[in-house]
């Protein structure tokens, strides 16, 4: 590939937010919700230039009259037509580039169905005519961004959480664990517990308001039971939030009850282990000789690890599970919301990476299955 002078595009398609930009940059140029909105009503004003669908921030700002759909659920694309719209919007409206002129690096969750990455590959080459592309595993990119080659990444986004142990740059597939519990589930849970307080949030548009409440006010308690006691006996933990219509609501123990579900999935009626236990289980599936290195390099990544207090709590929980002499270090980089994208930007601009791209020629020769041979 003679793409030396052409900047590669890096697109981190999250279940909740799409992060896009140019390889070599230190932050994504465009960050917008992975949403496609369609009008709930028929237009009556002629000449308003109404569209049959809106994408990203445009959909977000008109949410009162739209039905919002997320084409990516639990890290897996469930609606390819909408996904294509999001990519089209990314190239032409956000980045303002011609996709046929740039190699494209996409990301995906580990343990995704094979068909998912094949279809991504097919759309990139056949619909957008990209000269080259690559699909990278999200957690591996986060580790790159933290400047490490060994560690265990606990990545929790909007749709999926997973723990990926990586040793000397190799991910250890047998020890990767996936947890279909992430930000969107926390938002839904917040909707539910706010209902108990007498505030009703039901529509897709109202869910976005609750997501904002969660992002602005929620935190992780170091000791959940003690925090509940504190919340019950004083109003020190209460915060108020103004809704778009001016009504002010007060939230108290919901602030830490919501993200507690990451550590106690039983709150959501799920039988799975919490993120701390999943991390521990993942480490235990690795060779006994490398566990020490993993315990001392637990890297948090993704938007659902942005809650204040999460690193301290993670440290406390892992310390309780691990052997008593083990040194445990949780790394929570401030830019971890975007660390997958940043890692992608680093990877796509490495000189050694240039021979890793899948070229249009290779695709035409082998078809979509080439992605399994060239990308891991």
Swiss-Prot record:
GO terms for cellular component: actin cytoskeleton; cell cortex; cell leading edge; cell pole; cell-cell junction; cortical actin cytoskeleton; early phagosome; intranuclear rod. This is Actin-3. It is an enzyme of class 3 (hydrolase). Actins are highly conserved proteins that are involved in various types of cell motility and are ubiquitously expressed in all eukaryotic cells. Multiple isoforms are involved in various cellular functions such as cytoskeleton structure, cell mobility, chromosome movement and muscle contraction. Its EC number is 3.6.4.-. Pfam families: Actin. Keywords: ATP-binding, Cytoplasm, Cytoskeleton, Hydrolase, Nucleotide-binding. Belongs to the actin family. It is found in: Cytoplasm, Cytoskeleton. GO terms for molecular function: ATP binding; hydrolase activity; myosin binding; structural constituent of cytoskeleton. It catalyses: ATP + H2O = ADP + phosphate + H(+). GO terms for biological process: cell morphogenesis; phagocytosis; plasma membrane repair; response to cAMP. The keyword Aminoacyl-tRNA synthetase does not apply. Its main location: cytoplasm. InterPro entries: Actin, Actin/actin-like_CS, Actin_CS, ATPase_NBD. It comes from Dictyostelium discoideum.
């Amino acid at each position: 590939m003679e793409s030396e002078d052409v900047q590669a595009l890096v697109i981190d398609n999250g279940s909740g937010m799409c992060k896009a930009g140019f390889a070599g940059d230190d932050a994504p140029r465009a960050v917008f919700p992975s949403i496609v909105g369609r009008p709930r009503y028929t237009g009556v004003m002629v000449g308003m230039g109404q569209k049959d669908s809106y994408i990203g921030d445009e959909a977000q700002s008109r949410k009162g009259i739209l039905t919002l759909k997320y084409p990516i659920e639990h890290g897996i694309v469930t609606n390819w037509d909408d996904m294509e719209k999001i990519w089209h919007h990314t190239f032409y409206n956000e980045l303002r580039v011609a996709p046929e002129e740039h190699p494209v690096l996409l990301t995906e969750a580990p343990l995704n169905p094979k068909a998912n990455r094949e279809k991504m590959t097919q759309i990139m080459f056949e619909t957008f005519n990209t000269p080259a592309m690559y699909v990278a595993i999200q957690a591996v990119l986060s580790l790159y961004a933290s400047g490490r080659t060994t560690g265990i990444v606990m990545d929790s986004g909007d749709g999926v959480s997973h723990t990926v142990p990586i040793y000397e740059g190799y991910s250890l597939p047998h020890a990767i664990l996936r947890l279909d519990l992430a930000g969107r589930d926390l938002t839904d849970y917040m909707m539910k517990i706010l209902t108990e307080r007498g505030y009703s949030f039901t529509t897709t548009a109202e869910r976005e308001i609750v997501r904002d409440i969660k992002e602005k006010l929620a935190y992780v308690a170091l000791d959940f039971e003690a925090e509940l006691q504190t919340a019950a006996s004083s109003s020190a933990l209460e915060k108020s939030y103004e809704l778009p219509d001016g009504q002010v609501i007060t939230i108290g123990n919901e602030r830490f009850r919501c993200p507690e579900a990451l550590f106690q999935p039983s709150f959501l009626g799920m039988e799975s282990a919490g993120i701390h236990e999943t991390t521990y289980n993942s480490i235990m599936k690795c060779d006994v000789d490398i566990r020490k290195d993993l315990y001392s390099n637990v890297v948090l990544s993704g938007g659902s690890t942005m809650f204040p207090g999460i690193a301290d709590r993670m440290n406390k929980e892992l310390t309780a599970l691990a052997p008593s002499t083990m040194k445990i270090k949780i790394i929570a980089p401030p830019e971890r919301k975007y660390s997958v994208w940043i890692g992608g930007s680093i990877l796509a601009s490495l000189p050694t990476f240039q021979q890793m791209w899948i070229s249009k020629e290779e695709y035409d020769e082998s078809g979509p299955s080439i992605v399994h041979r060239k990308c891991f």
